[in-house]
């Protein structure tokens, strides 16, 4: 997969907006994009998938949260302002990204379930065991290193 500079710039803008305006290096944006792609490959390897119904339900829930909760509306409005996009552009980006976001969350959940089964822990999405959370984060953090030999950075 080839990552174009326009995608890197877009990711930098997103990461900067999410971090309160902090500057993001190209390399950090590229690494984040690569981790996201690798997570999708891992999810597919485990047989995970996302339905259009799941995407539609999550999109509707996000729009409802915007309408129902002032703090959500304020956060999204501030994000749009800092990213220099309209609310419609924000929702278009969310809708385009949701299948991958949901699939990455399913991967996290599956890794957590596997860890809990191996360690005789109860898997929960709310207040999950700390050991499980550390395992999942360490697993995901190691993905880039696992695939580093297959990655070529170009200018």
Write out the residue ranges for each language-model feature.
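A C-terminal, polar beta->alpha supersecondary segment
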Residues: 95-155
């Amino acid at each position: 997969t080839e990552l174009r500079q326009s995608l890197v710039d877009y990711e930098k803008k997103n990461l900067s907006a999410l971090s309160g305006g902090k500057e993001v290096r190209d390399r950090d944006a590229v690494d984040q994009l690569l981790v996201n792609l690798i997570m999708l490959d891992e999810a597919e390897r485990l047989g995970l998938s996302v339905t259009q119904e799941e995407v539609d339900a999550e999109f509707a829930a996000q729009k409802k949260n915007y309408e129902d909760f002032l703090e959500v509306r304020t956060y999204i409005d501030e994000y749009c302002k800092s990213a220099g996009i309209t609310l419609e552009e924000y929702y278009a980006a969310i809708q385009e990204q949701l299948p991958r976001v949901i699939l990455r969350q399913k991967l996290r959940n599956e890794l957590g379930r596997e860890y809990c089964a191996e360690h005789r822990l109860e898997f929960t999405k709310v207040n999950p065991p700390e050991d499980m959370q550390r395992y999942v984060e360490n697993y995901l953090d190691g993905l880039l290193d696992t695939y580093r030999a297959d990655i070529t950075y170009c200018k």
